[in-house]
Amino acid sequence: MAGQMSKFRRPEQLDLLPYIAKWLALAGLVALLAGSASALFLLSLDHATQWRETHPWVIWLLPVAGFAVGLAYHLIGKPVDAGNNLIIDEIHDPKKIVPLRMVPMVLIGTVVSHLFGASVGREGTAVQMGGALADQLTHVFRLRREDRRVILMAGISAGFASVFGTPLAGALFGLEVLAIGRMRYDALFPCVVAAIVADQVGQAWGVVHTHYVIGEVVPVQLWSVMAVVAAGIVFGLTGLLFATATHKLGAFVKRLITYSPLRPFAGGLLIAVAVWALGSNHYIDVDKYIGLGIPSIVQSFQMPMAPWDWLGKMVFTVVSLGTGFKGGEVTPLFYIGATLGNALAPLLHLPFGMLAGIGFVAVFAGAANTPLATIVMAMELFGPEIAPLAAIACIASYLVSGHTGIYHAQRVGHSKHHRPLPEEIRLSDIKQFHAQSESASERKVTLAGEEK
């Protein structure tokens, strides 16, 4: 009898139905919230950018705007000041619900930063809004610890997908950004649903994403592969430089200026003076280095550009983010990668549009440690033809950038290289770990010498 019953055991696929129904509903709700928030943000950003471009004198108010944003965070925003790192930390080690105030504060702070001329991006804002809004559902539905982790990841995916119009890359980003070398497949279905629906919600609100055309893509041959590997190494080192410079400047400014609202005030003053000083230079169009810089990114696919444009954007972005202006790192990284690829193309005998497109994603891959998301992003933005060469560059960039990144809270799930690192160590703790290891090695050598 028992043998007969085993023959009629319920198929395990039926057990998926409650799971699918649950996460279709939850991820769909996350997507509705995150997609709507991203739409409001992007439409506001468009208006802010248009107004700033027609009123160039407003750059002189950037220090005042920076002080205002810094003061708001100083008075009521300290619990959410960590931004993306707070979301990542809560996924790894859930403690308390992300405060809802993160949403209006980062939205207004980023729009104000763009309105007055800071060089910041938009991904960080969308991810923070998506994560914070998703986490409010933890209260509403009394989600368990593991479900809370998954819904936060879905919020990240929804925010990323809706702000860039790349649903598949957004889904992978939410899975991949948490830890180097490891992904959580238990969140794959919710992240994919949230990303796809959030992108559609944004479009339903009237959001139109930039369309990029890269032109000719060379065939995959030995010479093109070698050239792209070389470019990928440069892209990875550039991502490393960006992340390191931003973190080091931020730490230096915190030591130098103890009152936090004065940090973006000082940064805004420095940027305004630099724009004024360089504005009379006939060789440098400094206006390209403030704001998002989307027109320059589009131009990098169409014609040769000044070989120093990537460096100019990096300097203005590092100063903006390092002194406390709100916004993301990713769009500036797109700009840096695209213009650097444009500059490298003649040296490597590759079409500048193609290498600009590869640089667009590869610098981001190295700086964020998300090679899979960026490979898929290349296909979503530029077409499938670029996939093989983009994959080579993104992987090279990811490996060369080492265990650094723009997200301090990112963990090491699996080391990139053979040099051992403790599992789950935060990127911000690696330097201290190496210092302790070297100190322990020196003590061993000293003790061995004394014993002899």
Swiss-Prot record:
CDD domains: ClC_sycA_like
Entry's transmembrane regions: 23-43, 57-77, 97-117, 160-180, 188-208, 222-242, 264-284, 315-337, 344-364, 386-408
Pfam families listed in its UniProt record: Voltage_CLC
Signal peptide from the UniProt entry: none
InterPro entries in the cross-refs: Cl-channel_core, ClC, ClC-type_chloride_channel
Bilayer topology annotation: Multi-pass membrane protein
A cellular component annotation (GO) from this entry: plasma membrane
Induction entry: By fluoride, via a fluoride-responsive riboswitch.
Location of the protein in the cell: Cell membrane
Keyword terms of this UniProt record: Cell membrane, Chloride, Chloride channel, Ion channel, Ion transport, Membrane, Transmembrane, Transmembrane helix, Transport
Keyword Cell membrane tagged: yes
Task performed by this protein: Transports chloride and fluoride with similar efficiency.
Family of the protein in this entry: Belongs to the chloride channel (TC 2.A.49) family.
Record-given protein name: Chloride/fluoride channel protein
Source organism: Pseudomonas syringae pv. tomato (strain ATCC BAA-871 / DC3000)
Origin organism lineage: Bacteria, Pseudomonadati, Pseudomonadota, Gammaproteobacteria, Pseudomonadales
Gene name of the encoded protein: eriC
